[in-house]
Regions:
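Alpha-helix termination/capping residues and helix-transition junctions
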Residues: 32, 183-185, 246
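C-terminal "post-core" interaction segments
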Residues: 39-53, 91, 158-159, 197-352
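Bacterial Sec-dependent N-terminal signal peptides
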Residues: 1-45
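Flexible, low-complexity junctional segments that flank or bridge functional domains
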Residues: 37-224, 229-237, 251, 293, ...
Length: 352
């Protein structure tokens, strides 16, 4: 007997359709969805062992980073199968399944239940933060401007400072026009996305389009074409088209840290393709696989990376992106009320 397990994009198809002009990567992910939307699999009972088997097979057939991360998923099956029995309660099953998913070392992998969410946060928790809300408030002051999800002001050395804390916070074309107009006479721009954990990829694309003057290759994407670990389509190029609105023509320093993940990681990939952009700070947190979701027999939902993306040089960015200048926040500067990373960016812009 067969059962269709629905695999769907984390973002709704209606939203993707509405924003299709900018959603370059999301559009291709939708194509992958159409190809693999129904996964035919042996029906598993709603028991702890049945849910374990269902989860293992979903990941086995659809996860996209097994080879890149050198993960032996069959060995992991043997390791965790002995921990599962049909007499365990839901909390015990949740713990085993979450532990198994943690072997993927992927911040895009989650197990959602009514009572808890399984997650993997080592991609940023094991590293220095290199960002301080207290210090940032010293630079923004109290009279900063707000445009959608952006906070911005002109620093005292005529450098524009813009902070974007989450790509889940909407930013409109009018917002971006206002920011660029306000900063147009500045020496340069500091664009701070530290601790931006991602969000809506269309916001990342919309913002990146304000920094390019021609159609720019920013990376590649693949989607799964079969159940094998290496069953992928050919890499398909991804481009950013220049905005038809105001575009920033001066130097930009992009600030990053380990908290930059998912859509923010992709945005960093885009910006590294722009000739006037320099990246300063720490290695990003990664998260380059576009996430899909699937359901277990008991109704729990698993999210996982299904479509790998690459930078313009065909490199994986799942484990993050190196800055052009690796700069850490120092205790000495912190005690002086200075942000080492912002100060390094100011020096670069003032010396150019």
């Amino acid at each position: 007997m067969k059962k269709d397990i629905l695999v769907r994009l984390a973002n709704s198809p209606a939203k993707l359709a509405k924003q299709a002009k900018l959603a370059l990567l999301a559009s291709l992910a939708l194509l992958a969805f159409l190809v693999t939307s129904c996964v035919s699999q042996e029906e598993n009972p709603d028991t702890p062992t049945g849910n374990f088997e269902a989860l293992w097979h979903i990941i086995d057939e659809h996860y996209c980073f097994f080879d890149y991360k050198d993960i032996d998923w069959n060995q992991i099956y043997q390791t965790y199968k002995v921990r599962v029995n049909d007499n365990m309660n839901r909390e015990q099953l949740f713990e085993v399944l979450t532990d198994m998913l943690s072997e993927l070392r992927d911040g895009h992998v989650n197990l959602y239940t009514a009572f808890d969410n399984g997650r993997y946060w080592n991609w940023h928790e094991d590293y220095p933060t290199n960002f301080s809300d207290t210090l940032q408030r010293r630079y923004l002051g109290t009279d900063y401007r707000i445009a959608g999800g952006l906070r911005y002001r002109i620093l005292d050395d005529n450098i524009g400072y813009v902070y974007y804390g989450s790509f889940s916070s909407a930013v409109g074309e009018g917002n971006l026009d206002e920011v660029i107009q306000h900063l147009m006479f500045c020496q340069g721009m500091i664009l701070d996305i530290r601790s931006n954990g991602g969000g809506d990829l269309t916001n990342a694309e919309k913002l990146a389009a304000r920094f390019c003057n021609q159609k720019t290759l920013v990376g590649y994407i693949q989607h799964k074409t079969g159940k094998g670990h290496n069953d992928f389509s050919a890499q398909e190029p991804q481009y950013i088209e220049p905005s038809s609105n105001l575009r920033w023509q001066k130097k930009v320093v992009l600030l990053t840290n380990r908290g930059v993940f998912s859509a923010a990681n992709e945005f960093t990939t885009y910006m590294k393709c722009m000739p006037q952009v320099t990246v300063v700070g720490d290695h990003t947190g990664g998260g380059s696989g576009l996430p899909f979701t699937a359901s277990l027999p008991n109704g729990w939902t698993v999210r996982f990376s299904a479509c790998p993306t690459y930078d313009a040089n065909h490199n994986q960015t799942e484990f993050g992106i190196d800055p052009d200048y690796n700069v850490a926040l120092t205790d000495e500067d912190f005690n002086k009320g200075k942000d080492t990373i912002i100060e390094h960016a100011r020096t670069l812009l003032n010396n150019n």
